Amino acid sequence: MWNDTQMTEIVIPPVDWRVATQLSIIFGWASVLLVIALFVPRSRTRIVGYLAMVGAMVAAAVGIPLWGVNAETFSGMLRLDSYSLTLNWLFLAAAAITMVLSLDYLPRQGIERSEYYVLVLFATGGMMLLAQGADLIILFLGLELLSIVLYVLTGFAYPRNASEEAGMKYLLIGAFAGGFVVFGIALLYGATGSMNLRAIGETLAQQTLTLEERIYLLAGAALVVVGFGYKVAMAPFHMWAPDVYEGAPTPIAGLLSVGSKAAGFAALLRFLVEALAGEWQIWAPVLAVLAIATLAVGNIGALTQRNVKRMLAYSSIGHAGYILFGVIAAGAPGGIAGQRGVEGVLLYLIAYTFTNLGAFGVLIALEHRGEAAWDMSDLAGLWSRRPWLAVAMAVCMLSLAGVPPTGGFWGKFYVFTAAWLSGMGWITVIGVIVAAIAAFYYLRIVAQMFMAEPAREVPLPMDRALRAGLALATLGVLILGFLPTPAIDLVQRVVLGG
């Protein structure tokens, strides 16, 4: 029997619900919608979509009074600061635009089901966990939640074989990525005795690790980076991206290219800067080589594509290389380079989110004929057939190319400047050269739309929801380009702590 001396009191630490407010709204509302969806007939699926968007907007609005909060809860595992709050807003915006674009797409493709919108909300919650995670366990939980939901959404267009194949490929490769992260976490815990990112960084700064422990730490860190490298489609862990993007439902391909990538970089940046800042001299050159390899693979692959959806997949790989420039700079010792690195990553992700969602939105508008709408020839003479669509696609292509005055220009400018200030001038020069070469395949699409002979087919009219989603994405790109000051002020305040 137990006696009083053997009993230990269990103390539950207080919970700061400000930190978990947005997460609670998203997960709670998604769970409610899952029940509501059971009673909504298939012909009224849009109701669930509208309700899901309301939940995303409420979660975003609730975050406004939380600006300036810098707090942790659940024993330091979950953190809310200006960095994570900004990324949460970005994820919620991406989810809302994705759902708007899906309202017309799903019924046209015959895959309209209520659970689609619920799954998008759960995916958004996974992204937010990756942004707010201050502990390796939370980062892994967010990674797995996001991945599992996206496996389902990628294969959502069953019984279309391409979608099922894409879902299976993503599942198999994602499982390997998760395995790398788990092994990496085990080694990091074995070396430092902690899973908290700041605690790992403090242990490393004290220089009390033995040689064996330091080897375990670096090996564990490498495995975690490999795992997140799969998530952001960083070379040589990019192999899944073209096939998965092509086979996935087009709105989900857009969400994969922006939300999943942004969440992966959010976690990777926090991990490297907080836990491994003391080893910058080791991991920065390695990431620099991987960044150049990612640029090369992505842009060379995109140059050879006639399928616009696959081209955007390779383009997404290439853009991961540019974002890595900012990640490298963010961990650099000294003030200005690190600050500019974080600013560059955030600004690039904001611009890239609106740009890529707009580009995929145009493909959705043309997809009434199935896969043929993804061929370069389907864009021929688009200016004559649908001027508004041609302008939207041109704006997005120019932004992806980094042409001023679009949002993409400011993103590239900041990450290139950050890399230069960090002492990595050689990757900056290579990045500028590659960006100039990459402009060819973006401008090729613009020329196809405005200068080629128009196709004979008469396109179907666009749904109002699709028009609204495209307008939001395109206006976001233009506003970031012509009026960048608010976005720049926002990311600068993030670095300065609000």
UniProtKB/Swiss-Prot annotation:
Complex formation: NDH-1 is composed of 14 different subunits. Subunits NuoA, H, J, K, L, M, N constitute the membrane sector of the complex.
UniProt source species: Roseiflexus castenholzii (strain DSM 13941 / HLO8)
Coiled coil (UniProt feature): none
Catalyzed reactions per annotation: a quinone + NADH + 5 H(+)(in) = a quinol + NAD(+) + 4 H(+)(out)
Superkingdom classification of source: Bacteria
Protein name per UniProt: NADH-quinone oxidoreductase subunit N 2
GO CC annotation terms, alphabetical: plasma membrane
Gene designation per UniProt: nuoN2
Record's bilayer topology term: Multi-pass membrane protein
